[in-house]
Regions:
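N-terminal cap/leader regions of alpha/beta-hydrolase-fold enzymes
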Residues: 1-168
Length: 168
């Protein structure tokens, strides 16, 4: 297996048809691949988050992280974008789910996509991964130490769903 990959900033269609920034990494070798949506933490779409996405590509996955703060502070440094998002009250749950759905649709469109998709989030992104997994069809979900996940279950949350791994 080759560990060669390509990583780049792209535009995807998010909630409400909005065009949002995302960072994608994918292996160069041909083959059938699962896709993973990585959801960033409150400090945002930073260098460390992009490194997680690159590591997934090295391990054979198509991976993308949508910039959830694209609307509040387009092109801003991660810390400034995070501050703008916090000042606006954070990312609304409905918009988050729509942006993640857009990321999945992007992954689905890639050559070699095998139709299997997972979502991973860390810190506040862990909460977001949980919410996305409750609302969208994922084959796997990982919540990496997301705190204060929900006060009440999201409306329409299935009573039975695939296991969610919570790392704390």
């Amino acid at each position: 297996m080759s560990d060669a990959f390509i990583a780049e900033t792209i535009t995807i269609t998010g909630h409400g048809g909005d065009e949002i920034e995302a960072y994608r990494a994918m292996p160069l070798a041909e083959g059938s691949r699962g896709g993973i949506v990585w959801i960033h933490h409150m400090p945002g779409y930073d260098r460390e988050t992009k490194e997680f996405v690159r590591r997934l590509a090295v391990n054979g996955y198509h991976a993308v992280v949508p910039n959830l703060y694209s609307r509040e502070a387009p092109g801003a440094a991660p810390d400034d974008a995070a501050a703008a998002a916090r000042a606006a009250g954070g990312v609304p749950d409905e918009r988050l789910v729509g942006d993640v759905a857009g990321a999945v649709e992007h992954l689905r469109s890639l050559p070699g996509a095998n139709g299997k998709f997972g979502v991973i989030g860390h810190c506040s992104g862990g909460r977001h991964a949980y919410l996305a997994a409750c609302s969208l069809q994922f084959d796997a979900a990982v919540d990496c130490y997301g705190a204060f996940i929900v006060e009440d279950p999201p409306e329409g949350m299935p009573k039975a769903m695939k296991p969610i791994l919570h790392l704390a």
